[in-house]
Amino acid sequence: MAGVGAVSRLLRGRRLALTGAWPGTLQKQTCGFHFSVGENKKASAKVSDAISTQYPVVDHEFDAVVVGAGGAGLRAAFGLSEAGFNTACLTKLFPTRSHTVAAQGGINAALGNMEEDNWRWHFYDTVKGSDWLGDQDAIHYMTEQAPASVVELENYGMPFSRTEDGKIYQRAFGGQSLKFGKGGQAHRCCCVADRTGHSLLHTLYGRSLRYDTSYFVEYFALDLLMENGECRGVIALCIEDGSIHRIRAKNTVIATGGYGRTYFSCTSAHTSTGDGTAMVTRAGLPCQDLEFVQFHPTGIYGAGCLITEGCRGEGGILINSQGERFMERYAPVAKDLASRDVVSRSMTLEIREGRGCGPEKDHVYLQLHHLPPEQLATRLPGISETAMIFAGVDVTKEPIPVLPTVHYNMGGIPTNYKGQVLKHVNGQDQIVPGLYACGEAACASVHGANRLGANSLLDLVVFGRACALSIAESCRPGDKVPSIKANAGEESVMNLDKLRFADGSIRTSELRLNMQKSMQNHAAVFRVGSVLQEGCEKISQLYGDLKHLKTFDRGMVWNTDLVETLELQNLMLCALQTIYGAEARKESRGAHAREDYKVRVDEYDYSKPIQGQQKKPFGEHWRKHTLSYVDIKTGKVTLEYRPVIDKTLNEADCATVPPAIRSY
């Protein structure tokens, strides 16, 4: 893997003592790089003390830098390298440790291997699943690109499960239909048993090794380098040796994943801390729709580990304490394969009404033991293992205790379907020059208010590729990289120094736990105004407590105390925007279910014919995207709104799906 650890080796031999500070100057040292950095294309990286003599900064120059090396980041990075761009990929984890590896169920594409299918039907299902908050131009792009994207993965060597005649096996998944919702259940989810994310990530990583991409592994991105409204790279901390690095680039792609760890119980890795989302917030740019947090119906009770929707796609059913298949009452047609927000709310209602399972009656059961053992062994081997380890359940004999668990963030950094980051000025979308985003960190918005299962892996590969294509359309390899100020990134280093020597009264772990429990209690599956208001006050108070943090490790080498504190800052910014956005949205839509505002508020009442109705003004309905900003010093959240894009990329080829009452 080209470039891994090369930058760390630049400073090796000048390591800090665990409790020491950086020396004021660094002796010159040459180190052979295969990639180009600095003004002299053959020179090694430059060390500058323009920011601080205590924290010398190593400067690098690339055509493009990708932050994050999960599915989206890898696809963007090797797409850029393939096009000839001198590309850096910066990641706080080794690439195959990224959270993409945890995805289980599959990736949607209308291949038609199990029955006739059409990408336009997939488009319809995704728009409906989004509760008409998704942007239909982006959904059009994603669903049309889906079949080719899956074939591309197959050509890269991804070992999909197969039908008897050798085609890619496709299972049923929630919210998927044929013939625009009128043809029954679709089998559209391509899978590798129940380990699809693992296979996808390793396939993309293996593919990336073909290209001359420079990987900065175990580097923590601190902030974007912004000049005159343009993004010109990132500043990062090398976790291994504590060195600071400014990576200057004409194009920056954020692919840092979601912020699931704002909640106490979630299926996300502990590294899902919204780093990119927070960097954009600190840059003064908006985030979009953060109030829409998906609760996956089936997290293992007490552990939060994911049990894939593929279990229900293979024939598993949800039952209550009376042994009743209760989803038949809530979604008579789709039943257990209704969309995730519908199933999670139904489970919560069953528990509330006293039909929960166990001594506390606080969960339900997922039953699989009626399925043939050979089907469980071949299609759901990972789930069988996970259920035994985390619940002590043999799925061939007994049901799995499950509970809705935070799983995915529909909101993120606002982009168009090309991956270009947007801001909204005077009622118009404007592109932020040099900045792109993809994957769960981004909000295109293809998921709207609720994501369909197996659309997330599709999102990664389609929009990771889209970012690379967009950059290739507008730039050429070797284009001049815009300059940055000599002290660019100074505030980031000052913040790092402040946290490193923080000597307050609250531990990072204590404050993080308080935040997570507050989010879990105040912004859950069902929400109510008074509780949300209390949550806003609580999270604002906790944000203020950041100045009272106490860290214990004063060193710079593998200072995990410092890294976790930096992550907590990022989580706090995400939590603030999530709960304030939820309190402000006075309706129920998708994953945002208000008990005091139970109906969806559109520009028309779509439960009735719209003829004769007067369209509500923009300020009086909620079919619009939330844009949130945070004052970093005070924690004050400011909300604005932008309209949903209803037009597709080609109305003649793919007609807009008009809003309707959503039922399954």
Curated annotation (Swiss-Prot):
Active site (record annotation): R340 (proton acceptor)
Annotated pathway: Carbohydrate metabolism; tricarboxylic acid cycle; fumarate from succinate (eukaryal route): step 1/1
Gene Ontology terms: biological process: mitochondrial electron transport, succinate to ubiquinone; nervous system development; proton motive force-driven mitochondrial ATP synthesis; respiratory electron transport chain; succinate metabolic process; tricarboxylic acid cycle
Protein topology in the membrane: Peripheral membrane protein
PTM description: Acetylation of Lys-498 and Lys-538 is observed in liver mitochondria from fasted mice but not from fed mice. Deacetylated by SIRT3.
Binding site for oxaloacetate: H296, R340, H407, R451, A454
Residues modified as N6-acetyllysine: 167, 179, 182, 250, 335, 423, 480, 485, 498, 517, 538, 547, 550, 598, 608, 624, 633, 636, 647
Subunit structure: Component of complex II composed of four subunits: the flavoprotein (FP) SDHA, iron-sulfur protein (IP) SDHB, and a cytochrome b560 composed of SDHC and SDHD. Interacts with SDHAF2/SDH5; interaction is required for FAD attachment. Interacts with TRAP1. Interacts with LACC1.
UniProt name for this protein: Succinate dehydrogenase [ubiquinone] flavoprotein subunit, mitochondrial
Species assigned in the record: Mus musculus
Lineage: Eukaryota, Metazoa, Chordata, Craniata, Vertebrata
